[in-house]
């Protein structure tokens, strides 16, 4: 029916003749061309040109054949066209098969057998250690004490405050003797003898640059030794001479409770002078507090580190006139990283003070466990520091503190709360205010509930009330418990069970005993716990309940080895008769104790 088309891909030798051109009308030629596959539209330009010539020949031939009245093409010509298309298809298939077989053979030849490995760690690159950073850390630890003048003092260094009447102002001396004591404690004597004359002389020479002459002050003194009164006297002595209210002293403390405690001491010393003392109250909004401090700039500001950074960012006040920076409970402050307060504060000081670098502010750093923070002290950029130490040990216990260890056999460890109550009659004091330290918040709640049940069942020989300071209570509840504990009635025993929340800085007068129901984890923590009693030259007692040989060895190796005591101080152990009396339990007491345990179990399970 159709004539074979011209195949441009087919080559003809010389002498061969091309197949006759198909004789199709022009319209039919176009229809046939449109029916071709779209693949032919993407062929080379040479093929398109050849097809165009082919079409022209078809038009010429069709005209000639129309003149002869022929409307169809012979069957032989149609077979030739189909054969040409089929041959092209077969050549394409054969070439594709050849390419596929070559690829398969190549891939088979390149494939390597898989290697079997055992379960071994994957090889890692060698660790690149920053030796420069390690050397830098070592250098920082060494530089923390470089150019440090060590001043040793002992428990015999007491002196009446009247001996300083030629240096201290009349009003300040009257406030000290009337509100605190007539005799200076050892650390107060050491500071007043060494620092006060130097500070007064430097201030009289230059009111602007006297901080460089004095240098920084580091004090390692036991808790309850009068550190707060010591630095407050130095501040009021200098600031009472100023003429205009400007922020000249910042006292940093770690907790809100300490803010108010320090404020009471500083405000009592500033009575009768024009020194303005302010505190940052955490229960007021930051915006309201900022407006108040801007309206009346204080001379002394008592604040926590995080709140200080907030005010610096709000530009509540400037550090341009700052002369004193006091860190109370410095070891705890330096362990805190609220908003990177230390770096932020040092940066602001160097930027805002008239002269840059160390010495632009007198830094007073106080703690009972100061010597363990040498690396962090370097961040404070100390300038010619003077280090006040008592003894050669890390920590020193006050001479008025009596310590006792009560070994408890492991077989009697289940009755530890009962032994605690049996201990009370041996504590010969008219009014017992006992602070019991445990290891966790849950232990505080459980022990307080169990002791209350035991007192209710008659296992206590003295009238006793028990309270628990814990994080489950609201702040108001904890504050009321502390106030009730501090105001305990005469002839009554008050027990307050707490974690180490109460072991730092809190000054409650009249705590007669500290009982370490659970041993602290370090000598540092032990010093702070025992420091809640025997404060301000008053007597106090600490009792440690040691269960089994393990706790006794821990006490000896990790706590007692770091502590120095007065020669005529603690006995450390109960005598054998007292110990046997405490750990020997009657069947009646044991039965009552088990009954109390069942009551506690029912109350916990809610049955």
Curated annotation (Swiss-Prot):
Domain Helicase C-terminal: 419-578
Region (Disordered): 1-83
Keywords: ATP-binding, Helicase, Hydrolase, Nucleotide-binding, Nucleus, Ribosome biogenesis, RNA-binding, rRNA processing
Primary localization class, coarse: nucleus
Annotated motif DEAD box, positions: 328-331
A GO term for molecular function: ATP hydrolysis activity
The protein's name in its UniProt record: ATP-dependent RNA helicase DBP6
